[in-house]
Amino acid sequence: MANAKEIKTKIASVQNTQKITSAMEMVAASKMRKAQDRMAASRPYAENMRKVIGHVAQGSLEYKHPYLEVREAKRVGYIVVSTDRGLCGGLNVNLFKKVVADVKKQREAGAEVEFCTIGARSAQFFNSFGGQVSASASGLGDAPKLADLIGTVRVMLEAYNEGKLDRLYVVFNKFVNTMTQAPVIEQLLPLPKSEDDEFTHQWDYIYEPDPKLLLDTLLVRFVESQVYQGVVENIASEQAARMVAMKAATDNAGELIGDLQLVYNKARQAAITQELSEIVSGAAAV
């Protein structure tokens, strides 16, 4: 058994760690609330944009935009959104597992894959995973702007425009609630048709003045908005996961301190008992 001094040092060390994890929990909770506000503000726009674009994909258009044409999936691109930092539980691991499983299916079907990573963790993982990483962005902070993502997204759009990609997906952790974050893979290109059951009829649009100019701008904005929403959702998921992880670490530290305190008390008791025995033995010898 370790002596009382060593145990006391361990207790102090765990208490210091507990203070750090408790502070990180409070910081994550504050950041999560702010991230939730940003997510709630941008989610209606992203969802309605996807719905409108889904109707466009079902419509009979005067001008057939390349983003509406379904091609054989010989090369597939993934825009993978992860965190820059760790200490957020299994958030990134679960996301990467989902991507790897989907990539395996694509490769079994004979397709090649290409990645665009947003977040330092995804860049580290996919650079070692195998497959081409065409673009990367990291260090966006807790409140990124759409302008911070445009350059990275454009790399994948240009690859699609040039026929180097036949499918494009965005992958991120969708914020469900504080305890639940779900990794999702959403198709960006070719444009997915609307899954809204309310609209069973065809949507026909009249574009003024020029359908090509309008669609060229609108469809690019759609892709950018979906990626931005994925980034915002992922940030909220990151802070929620970190808050939960730090709370668990703080609670575990408390339990460990309690266990160490019991060991310390036993060590102190043993030391005192030994001292008393030595005193009694010495007195008897005299």
From Swiss-Prot:
Primary localization: membrane
GO biological process, one term: proton motive force-driven plasma membrane ATP synthesis
Function: Produces ATP from ADP in the presence of a proton gradient across the membrane. The gamma chain is believed to be important in regulating ATPase activity and the flow of protons through the CF(0) complex.
GO MF entry, a single one: ATP binding
Membrane topology term: Peripheral membrane protein
Protein name per Swiss-Prot or TrEMBL: ATP synthase gamma chain
Record's subunit section: F-type ATPases have 2 components, CF(1) - the catalytic core - and CF(0) - the membrane proton channel. CF(1) has five subunits: alpha(3), beta(3), gamma(1), delta(1), epsilon(1). CF(0) has three main subunits: a, b and c.
This protein's UniProt keywords: ATP synthesis, Cell inner membrane, Cell membrane, CF(1), Hydrogen ion transport, Ion transport, Membrane, Transport
Provenance organism: Shewanella pealeana (strain ATCC 700345 / ANG-SQ1)
Domain of life: Bacteria
Family statement drawn from the similarity comment of this UniProt entry: Belongs to the ATPase gamma chain family.
Stored PROSITE patterns: ATPASE_GAMMA (PS00153)
Annotated GO CC locations: plasma membrane; proton-transporting ATP synthase complex
Statement: the UniProt record of this protein carries the keyword Cell inner membrane: yes
Compartment(s) where it occurs, according to its Swiss-Prot or TrEMBL record: Cell inner membrane
